Regions:
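Adenine nucleotide-associated cytosolic modules
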Residues: 1-258
Length: 258
């Protein structure tokens, strides 16, 4: 896909993105795709922080961000968008300023709220790829359903302790959805929060970086191996595993007759 530098990129952009465009799979045509693309990130925590920074740095033209929380002291161990001076400020405001400072060519649209069934379609409208960097199953299930029904590719990541997981749910008759893997919502007691079980910040960041990689590939029109697989990361053992995901005929979201 590599091509000569394009006249519609400024001299500053030409230098900024030169390392991207040297990649055969990107080139200036791919860089132009990224600049014209629209990516939504749900959750500006440990995973979302890393994903947002690398998407902005790569040159994604429009980033959406949903988060209704303020910056807390305990966030700073892993949520690298924020600094000590940001304590008490709303995350989306801090994130917008940080991302714009990193790349002024990137437009950031923020939603200082939590997703719910009443607002999810409006918030996601117009975005080509959605990254689920949330930390709770109600939001994950809501995104899984809305993205699948509206035909939006979903890149979902989670992290706890030393461990992380990543998958891509690409709507299509032959592909499994998120709920083929997690058909029913786990109870709150079965899934402890990071405040209960702990989390290594670098693991959350690793999963956010991998999320950004998958999103950037999708925007180039490249197929992801994770549409039918789950990538599991064990930071303690220093090991990745790629596990098969199967489309379930009885899936409550994408099964037969759905």
């Amino acid at each position: 896909m590599r091509t000569e530098a394009r006249a519609d990129f400024s001299s500053q952009e030409t230098v900024r993105y030169s390392r991207n465009t040297l990649l055969d799979q990107v080139g200036w045509e791919g860089q132009a795709r990224w600049r014209a693309s629209r990516v939504m990130v749900v959750g500006a925590g440990g995973i979302g922080s890393a994903a947002l920074l690398y998407l902005a740095a790569a040159g994604v033209g429009r980033l959406g961000l949903v988060d209704g929380d303020a910056v807390e002291e305990s966030n700073l161990q892993r949520q690298i968008l924020y600094r000590s001076a940001d304590l008490g400020r709303q995350k989306v405001a801090v994130a917008e300023a940080a991302l714009t400072a990193l790349n002024p060519h990137c437009r950031v649209e923020t939603f200082d709220q939590r997703l719910n069934p009443a607002n999810v379609k409006e918030v996601l409208h117009g975005f080509e790829v959605v990254l689920d960097a949330s930390d709770n199953f109600p939001t994950r299930f809501l995104l899984a359903e809305c993205c699948w029904r509206d035909g939006i590719p979903l890149v979902s990541a989670a992290a706890t302790g030393w461990y992380g997981k990543l998958l891509v749910a690409l709507p299509g008759a032959e592909n499994p959805c998120y709920r083929c893997l997690v058909p029913e919502m786990p109870s709150a007691e079965a899934v402890p929060s990071s405040s209960e079980s702990g989390i290594l910040g670098a693991v959350a960041g690793t999963m956010g970086c991998l999320q950004a990689v998958e999103a950037l590939k999708l925007l180039l029109g490249r197929e992801s191996n994770l549409t039918r697989r789950l990538l599991a990361y064990d930071g303690l053992a220093g090991r990745f595993q790629s596990l098969a995901r199967i489309k379930r005929p009885d899936c409550p979201l994408c099964g037969q007759g759905k």
